[in-house]
């Protein structure tokens, strides 16, 4: 059991939550405006009107996302080793450095767009490369899950972090759209850059301070921080050793070591049966959970590419697209608020997570089909419902954290990071290709893939619901 001093020296949950909220909010303020910046850069590069860069924008944005997650997939083993042998905070720091380069390169490209129009591809792909190599995405998610185990936080830590990401994804684009009505694109980048930098300098240094103090107390007391399960197993075996076995041991005259000893044979068979039943009920759902996690990661890029659908196919303005994105994330905020409330009162159980995931994926299948018939008037309402139903991130990440064994968590964090990066790496090019095909032929081709993914996810969630 962790000592009282060690518990006091753990990084404050409020500190981590506040830092993560401000960090994600400042970065997501440019989630839609970066599409406008890419449009401007490509229009300058090809010397064509901005309305004619639609197909080039979809190809470049898909290629940049593909590059980012390809690099993120390659560096997963490196960051997994760092997380295991050094500290999870290293990935948090490198991710911040990658985001800082995003702000730096974007600001310079706006300032010198007319002087260096040929640098469009360098700016776009260098940002994608450095965001990927810095650990943004899969490696960062694995780091937060490792922090949960490192400081003995409960699984609700993962649920709250994923909920905060959705909250910031709602607040950020909404603030960005409002500010863009009053300030220029350059000023918006400078404002978000300043918030992002100051937030890290203040909060993360405090977190590192608490982390070092916690680790020093743990080392002094000889506590294996990441191997607490071994201590629990020792205590479990001690509790399940009956007094009769201790009483009979002197009378057996050393026969306990013999395989013919009925006492030792009975105990061995009993523990073997207990472990077999435990493993069967605990580890068997893990493949289904990981399959649901993979399908959820496949679905993630859909609405990001749908923003391009709104810009190019539906001919909506950047302010309208930003507003619709905010409405979608507001729906996600509603769902995550319910998850946070249930987590706070202790009602967000594993069964509740499974049920939420099943209902969410089933409803999302229907809404994606209806999105094909959406108009400019009905799209905000559909975006709201899509945000409500598709926000199963806290549930799926909570299930992964709940079902992963505690004895060797790094193996599973590495595997889930590889799954997430692989899914996004596969999904982006196929959905982008479907979007390009829909520009030339039929718009419904863009919606077929996400509908099939949601159907498979619904079936997997239904199978998972039958296991404890």
Swiss-Prot record:
Entry's Gene Ontology cellular component terms: plasma membrane
Compartments it resides in: Membrane
Keywords associated with the record: Meiosis, Membrane, Transmembrane, Transmembrane helix
InterPro entries, sorted: MFS_trans_sf (IPR036259)
SUPFAM superfamilies assigned to the protein according to its UniProt record, in alphabetical order: MFS general substrate transporter
Primary localization: membrane
GO MF term set: transmembrane transporter activity
Transmembrane spans: 13-33, 59-79, 92-112, 116-136, 158-178, 190-210, 285-305, 330-350, 356-376, 382-402, 417-437, 446-466
Residue ranges the record marks as coiled coil: none
Record's bilayer topology term: Multi-pass membrane protein
Domain of life: Eukaryota
GO BP terms in the entry: meiotic cell cycle
Role played: Has a role in meiosis.
Protein name: Meiotically up-regulated gene 111 protein
Species of origin: Schizosaccharomyces pombe (strain 972 / ATCC 24843) (Fission yeast)
Gene: mug111
